Amino acid sequence: MLKLKAHLLTQGMHGMISQVEGLSRALNLSFKHHTVNLKSFWKFIPPKFTFISENLLTEKFICDSRVIISCGRKSVVHSIALKKRLKNKIFNIHIQDPKVSLKNFDLIICPEHDGLKGENVITTKGAIHYLRKNEINKKSKYLKLDKEGKKVVTVIIGGPNKYYDYSENQTNIIFNKIKTIFTPDKYKLIVIPSYRTPEDVVRKAFNAFSHNHLVIKDVDKNAYLASLSLADIIVVTCDSISMISEAAITEKPIYVANMMSVKNNKRFKYFFSQFKKLGIIRDLEDKVDLWSYNQLDEVNRLAPLIKERMKLNGII
């Protein structure tokens, strides 16, 4: 039997792609990605103030899929426009709070820290993603790392957003703390940047750690997966809920490297509190411990619930 097709709509960021692809895989859908771009003026307008039309898109496509999975602000208009045109021929799922009427979607998948509620809303702990433990372990030999009999610490660096600005001072504080805690006589570090990591922060990390440790200077998915496989301990900067959620598939200790927020980060505080209660994360401080927790695999927990909704709508 042919797999049901899904069209994945995002703005092309790693965190969004990870979520839509992870969900489509859990639902056993064949899929293709489409990066959404709105025409110049409309890309700056919030969805709730935007009229719904496919004419706002810089590029249209023929929708030959029964399922639309979207994530991110700019994809909202496209998903709703397709739903208006194709009606019950498609099942549209949006990941994250769309900031518009929930009635525009058949289903919304939203993290608990967003505080969204509705009959067509299913909530998750943290962000859903595409990572699987067996896929991570397959990449363990991708990085040629001499552990030298030491504990391996993977340090995953995010980048600035509206809550964290990655100022030189804050970056220095984090890097100095990591150097002080994870001394080279006991630990071997793998430092991994993300798509959002500024070039100057990557250079600073290289200068700070490359003498004794392995610093990956370019974004490399295989290196990222290998680093998760090799790690005894994982450190993730506090700016990325997606990367912390991805790391939680490993069941390995996750330390969050905190920095000062530039504005009230209520959603982040809720998320950190929730993951601490689940025993997944701890703040990066002076003491280093090893611990384990139950694997967090939200996307596969949700899959049967979503399939039931799709059956009710006659999609499967």
What are these regions (language model features)?
Residues 272-316:
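Leloir-type glycosyltransferase catalytic cores
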